[in-house]
């Protein structure tokens, strides 16, 4: 449980690192739709820590000009957490200095499925025709509709898999994997990732320029 506690507290440090380095958007994968399969006591502990985090951090985030967003199926969370999320998002909605997305009860497949269902309803009602559906329109139905696609995905813990995270959005995202686990991840590792990323050539399906 200590790892979970430190991991949640680590969020504040990484937000500050991003701010110091001029990065304006950060998304952290906190709890997946599949994490409900974990032992009930562990899930309860995690949810209590998320709730405590919201109580402790949101006012300070607002003072720093941070816009807080939660992406995921919020309706499955407890009424108490949902209430705190609504307050936090409402309080910080106008902030533009930094955007922090917390992926909570999130799944990339679930996000795409939700988008497809919403589009299907629009077509069924006659408000949208199939011919209008393209990549640009589809993006508008994602949880991250108002945000650019990620430039860099950092995977801690040495795992070489995406774990159902932002499946649509990371089509051309660069990956950086570190054996360091999230509770121990800090500014040093973040800078290593950025330095590696800075030397890459992003081709978006094109060819390398010599």
Segments from the language model and where they lie:
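Flexible, compositionally biased loop and terminal segments
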Residues: 1-210
């Amino acid at each position: 449980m200590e790892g979970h506690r430190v991991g949640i507290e680590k969020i504040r440090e990484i937000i500050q690192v991003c701010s110091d380095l001029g990065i304006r958007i950060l998304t952290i994968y906190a709890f997946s739709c599949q994490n409900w399969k974990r032992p009930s006591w562990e899930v309860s502990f995690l949810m209590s820590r998320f709730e405590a985090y919201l109580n402790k951090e949101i006012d300070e985030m607002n003072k720093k000009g941070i816009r807080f967003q939660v992406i995921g199926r919020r309706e499955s969370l407890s009424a108490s957490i949902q209430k705190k999320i609504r307050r936090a998002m409402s309080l910080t909605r106008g902030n533009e200095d930094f955007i922090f997305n917390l992926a909570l009860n999130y799944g990339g497949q679930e996000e795409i499925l939700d988008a497809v269902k919403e589009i299907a309803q629009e077509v069924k009602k006659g408000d949208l025709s199939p011919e209008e559906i393209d990549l640009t329109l589809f993006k508008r139905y994602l949880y991250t509709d108002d945000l650019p696609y990620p430039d860099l995905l950092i995977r801690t813990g040495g795992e070489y898999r995406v774990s159902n995270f932002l499946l649509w959005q990371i089509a051309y995202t660069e990956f950086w994997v570190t054996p360091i686990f999230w509770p121990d991840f800090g500014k040093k590792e973040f800078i290593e990732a950025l330095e590696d990323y800075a030397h890459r050539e992003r081709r978006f399906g094109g060819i390398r320029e010599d």
